[in-house]
Amino acid sequence: MNIILVTDIFGKTPALVKLSEELNAKVIVDPYAGVDMAFKDEAEAYSYFMENVGFEDYLSILLEMTESITSASTLIGFSIGASIIWKLSENNSVKNVNRAICFYGSQIRNFKKVNPLFEVELIFPKEEFHFDVLELQNELSKKENVRTTKVDYLHGFMNLYSTNYNQFAHNEQLNWLRINAS
């Protein structure tokens, strides 16, 4: 099984490269064509992403990559990467993705009508500022091909560069991914 990581707004960072090695992921999809942008903080990363890439262009990057996949693959996405995976999951031109694991995809709340064509595991943080996590989790868990989990950590807990990074949570979820992503 191929594992493909789909990054958040920070893009391809040294920490994400390390995660890809730990999971034996063959591909990292990011919005900046593989360039480490070395953002100083989340505000800078968000501003740059919104001004220079945006949701739809990042979705197009992922769609183009997934259309070239020739063997069964699992997508693992973080934040905006998780949200674009969610949106992609309803596209019937995507043939060789059989599973996705999406960490804290907060923009999923704007695409509640999506009906995934492959299995999607949504991992929600304990809370989000812009919406009720439990309400969204309950709504989406009723859909076919969707499983939801709410963890006791904040949005960004897997990202070393996030103010909400949590080493314990990162290690816990890394171990879970090693068992469940392949």
Regions found by a protein language model. Name each.
Residues 1-70:
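Serine-hydrolase catalytic machinery in alpha/beta-hydrolase-like enzymes
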Residues 18-19, 131-140:
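Short alpha-helix in the alpha/beta-hydrolase fold that links the catalytic acid
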Residues 72-77, 103:
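Short beta-strand immediately N-terminal to the catalytic nucleophile in serine-hydrolase-like folds
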Residues 76-85:
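Gly/Ala-rich beta-loop-alpha elbow adjacent to hydrolase catalytic centers
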Residues 94-95, 111-118, 140-143:
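Short, conserved loop/helix-junction motifs that constitute active-site signature segments
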Residues 94-106:
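A conserved short beta-strand
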Residues 121-124:
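Short beta-strand/loop motif that positions the catalytic acidic residue
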Residues 146-182:
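C-terminal catalytic histidine-bearing segment of alpha/beta-hydrolase fold enzymes
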